[in-house]
Every structure is written in structure tokens, then in C-alpha cells.
Amino acid sequence: MKSVDAASLPAFLERRPLVVDVRSPVLFRQGSLEGALNIPTADIQQKKHQLPKDRPILLVCERGIQSELAGLYLEADGYAEVYNLAGGLNALKR
């Protein structure tokens, strides 16, 4: 899995990745990246999603830990272009 840091995020978003926020719906409603989908980590683990395998996927959470775990599940399921926002959404607030 590859990482994207806060400084390179704007350029990475120009590639039009599918942005997936893996936090709970309650936290997601408090704010996320524009255009993000909310698919909690447990749903990714249990394959309760229909994420495309032919598009880059950027996973985000609060600190980058939960999204990294979700990325490992996706990679184990055959997803090749999985990216994690290093430091999570908190890194964007610094």
C-alpha cells in the first residue's frame, strides 16, 4: 500500500481517486474530504462494498491507522491501487 502525505494530497486528488472515509457514519458526518464515500473498516473487512478494482482508492480516517488496516483488507482482496492518507485527516489540520 502506498501513502499520500498532506503536502502531496492536492496533486494526488487531481488523479480523481475514489476517496473512502473508513470512520463511523457519526464521525463521517462531522466532516471529511469533499466527495468522500463512507464505508467503515468493518464493512471493508466483511466485503460489504462494491469498490471498483480499476480505479485508485484513497482511504482516510482520523489518524491514518484505521485506513491503513482497511487498505490491507483491500490489498488481500486483490486491489492494486490502494493509498492511505498518512497521518489521516488530523494531518490536514496542522
What residue ranges belong to the model's regions?
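Rhodanese-like catalytic fold shared by cysteine-dependent sulfurtransferases
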Residues: 1-18, 24-56, 63-94
